Amino acid sequence: MNDFVFSDIPDILKPMASVEFDDPLTKATGDVLNWTLWLIRNFPALSNIIMRLPSSLVSIVTSSFEGANQMFQVTTSTHNLYSASLPTHATKQIISKLVEHEKTHIGPKNKDCVVQRLLNAHRDSESKISIPTPDATVRSEAIGFTLAGTADPPNILALGTFMAARDPEMQEGLYKELRAVWPDLRSPVPSYNLLHQLPLLRGVVKESIRFTHGVATGPARLVGAGGARIGGYNVPAKASLAVVAAPSYFVHMDETVFSEPEKFEPRRWADNDYSKSLVAFSRGRRMCPAEQFHVEPYETTSVPRSEERG
């Protein structure tokens, strides 16, 4: 995910470079995803107050905001992210320093990474009035991608690997399917377009997404003008407590959509696309734009895991 968002990543942020398999950005992200998102969703006024407190007081109010404080607060820290070591508390300024480094460092840059795309959008645009993307916007997008990439991929990959490991028939099917398109393991991993055509692999990935649910409950939504009637209930317009959401768990476990929903069955996807019923990334105009990006690394990462048995 870091390589997708940034073009130059310091070693300290590469988990595999750490003997502890632990980097400060991942730790902070994990802390954010405990009670923090729940509090922000249901008590936005409380979160606004807490995030304005000095960092020394945040943990006194609630430890749930320590990770968020580390990620979002811009401090006067002078630590260099690209030095040999980095104190954990310096995560408070990680995103800001990474974005600034993307703007100023000399050397090869990945022009297709998220941050470089945002920084150079005004140069690529044909509009004569296009202006540079504000740094605050770039930081916000970088944080969003980092949060999303840290939360879901480990869960989905771990579940898919576990389910395949306990099912010899599934293992054999994946092995044969992959060796048919990748006979020489010394050659590069096949392209995503080719892997996506493999029905069993695609089914394992999508079934893993269905079982892990993504963000289980969507962000708050107020009912529009005129109100609404949902499930037999009248919901008033713009009511401050009228939050309408369909948790993905109940959709993914709906027997009228998925037969035997509690059974991990990758082959169900070969007979039915179920695209509109897989809501881990939500659906509609406001759905997560990273759905296709998420599916691609799951499939390409699952391939080496499956081939290791050979």
UniProtKB/Swiss-Prot annotation:
Enzyme Commission number(s) of this protein: 1.-.-.-
This protein's pathway: Secondary metabolite biosynthesis
GO molecular function terms listed in the Swiss-Prot or TrEMBL record: heme binding; iron ion binding; monooxygenase activity; oxidoreductase activity, acting on paired donors, with incorporation or reduction of molecular oxygen
Keywords from the named record: Heme, Iron, Metal-binding, Monooxygenase, Oxidoreductase
UniProt superkingdom: Eukaryota
InterPro entries in UniProt: Cyt_P450, Cyt_P450_E_grp-IV, Cyt_P450_sf, Cytochrome_P450_monoxygenase
Keyword Oxidoreductase: yes
Transmembrane segment boundaries: none
The protein's required cofactors: heme
SUPFAM superfamilies: Cytochrome P450
Amino-acid positions noted as binding heme in the UniProt annotation, renumbered to this chain: 288
Function (record text): Cytochrome P450 monooxygenase; part of the gene cluster that mediates the biosynthesis of pyrrolopyrazines, secondary metabolites showing insecticidal activity. The role of ppzG within the pathway has still to be determined. The single multifunctional NRPS ppzA is sufficient to produce peramine via condensation of 1-pyrroline-5-carboxylate and arginine, N-methylation of the alpha-amino group of arginine and reduction of the thioester and the cyclization to form an iminium ion resulting in release from the peptide synthetase.
Similarity field: Belongs to the cytochrome P450 family.
Protein's name according to its UniProt entry: Cytochrome P450 monooxygenase ppzG
Annotated gene: ppzG
